[in-house]
Each structure stands twice: as C-alpha cells, then as structure tokens.
Amino acid sequence: MSDPFGSPFPSLHDQNLNAQHAMASDHRLANAASYQSYQRQRQMTLGDLLLENRIVFMQGEIHYANANEIVMKLLYLQSENRRKDIHLYINSPGGSVTATLAIYDTMQMLSCPVATYCVGEACSGAAVLLIGGAKGKRFCLPNSRVMMHQPLGGVSGQVSDIEIQAAEMFRYRDKLNEIISSHCGKSVEQIAKDTDRDFFLDAQQAKEYGLVDDLLLGTPASEEDED
C-alpha cells in the first residue's frame, strides 16, 4: 500500500540506486580522463615529454635556430613555475658566440635555477653554458669532457674590415674570459692564459678547476626528494 502522504525523503532503495549511479558516473569520468591522458602522451614527441619534466637537451653545434628554440623553452618553463629547477643537459662542440650568449643571458635572467649537466662534451661556447648553471647545480657525467678556448673567427676582405672583425673577436674573448672567471673563481688573467689554446679537462679536472660542482654518478635528486 502506497504512502498517501508521500514522504519527502528518498527510500533506502532509492539512496542505494543514486549511490550506484554516482559511482558508475565517476568511473566513466575516470576512464575518460585516463584515455585522454593516454592519447595525449601518444601524440607527444620525446622533446615534449622531456619538457614536461622541465628537461631541456642541447645537442650539436650552437647556432641561431637552436639557440632561439632553447631560449623559448627556458622562458616557457619559467612561465610554468618561477621557482622549480630547469635541467639543461649539454652535449655540444660549441658554435656561434652570439647565439651562445643569447642562451647564457637568458639563463642568468631567469628566476628559477638552471641546473646544468655535461653529457659527452661541453666545448667552447657550450662550456660557458655549463659553467653558467646555478651554483651547486652544475654537473659532469664521469666520462664527459670540457674544452675552453678563445673565440675562433675567419675573416677576409679589406684591411679595414679585417681590423673591425679582429677588434670584435678580441672584445668577445675578453667578455667570455670575464664570464668564466666570475663562475669558477679563477682570475681573468689565469683564464686568458689557460684558454690561449684548446684547454681540455676531464670531468674530475673540470670539478677541480671550478667549472662544475660535482660529478653525477646517479640519477639527479628531484626537488621532491630533497624536501
């Protein structure tokens, strides 16, 4: 017999049905979210996946195109989180001085620390980027090497043009020596003397010279691990 007054409260049976419907809806939403995440990961490139983990990998010669790309990645990662570390992995023989300095200046401008890692080699301008990482967060892998030297340039033309280009190369040489000196603690005079010719250092020598803070023998600790 039905209730002639019509109770305003749902019966226990109705409550159970509502709970089951809610659980089924939550399950469908969770499955949909999981599928969307899976589809997104399938569409992401390896570079995208690294960037999602705040990792930037610089490989090959440094030139304007890849320097601009690295600068954009650094700026993007800062916009995502102004405090969390960026991890810059370097395997490069160096390249354009101006392209190198574009990356270096951006690294110094960021509010978030940039940890640097030498993987294979960091030579010429790439060594400047390795050295320019956040203090205490510059690393060499055990079998990597670092090489520094004065800027190279080949010019031709009228004598006046050659003189102009030579003066510019000397200016860059002095600027790079000052940058290296400021990060490793050696005098500018010592840097100029050591880099007059190709100056190679293995990982341990790079640490002793003050170019990096330590050798990386295991997986870098995340900020969550440190907390």
Curated annotation (Swiss-Prot):
GO terms for cellular component: cytoplasm; endopeptidase Clp complex. Pfam families: CLP_protease. The active site is at S124, H149. CDD domains: S14_ClpP_2 (cd07017). The keyword Secreted does not apply. GO terms for molecular function: ATP-dependent peptidase activity; ATPase binding; serine-type endopeptidase activity. It is an enzyme of class 3 (hydrolase). Its EC number is 3.4.21.92. Keywords: Cytoplasm, Hydrolase, Protease, Serine protease. InterPro entries: ClpP (IPR001907), ClpP/crotonase-like_dom_sf (IPR029045), ClpP/TepA (IPR023562), ClpP_His_AS (IPR033135). GO terms for biological process: protein quality control for misfolded or incompletely synthesized proteins. It catalyses: Hydrolysis of proteins to small peptides in the presence of ATP and magnesium. alpha-casein is the usual test substrate. In the absence of ATP, only oligopeptides shorter than five residues are hydrolyzed (such as succinyl-Leu-Tyr-|-NHMec, and Leu-Tyr-Leu-|-Tyr-Trp, in which cleavage of the -Tyr-|-Leu- and -Tyr-|-Trp bonds also occurs). It is found in: Cytoplasm. Cleaves peptides in various proteins in a process that requires ATP hydrolysis. Has a chymotrypsin-like activity. Plays a major role in the degradation of misfolded proteins. Fourteen ClpP subunits assemble into 2 heptameric rings which stack back to back to give a disk-like structure with a central cavity, resembling the structure of eukaryotic proteasomes. Belongs to the peptidase S14 family. This is ATP-dependent Clp protease proteolytic subunit 1. The lineage of its organism: Bacteria, Pseudomonadati, Planctomycetota, Planctomycetia, Pirellulales.
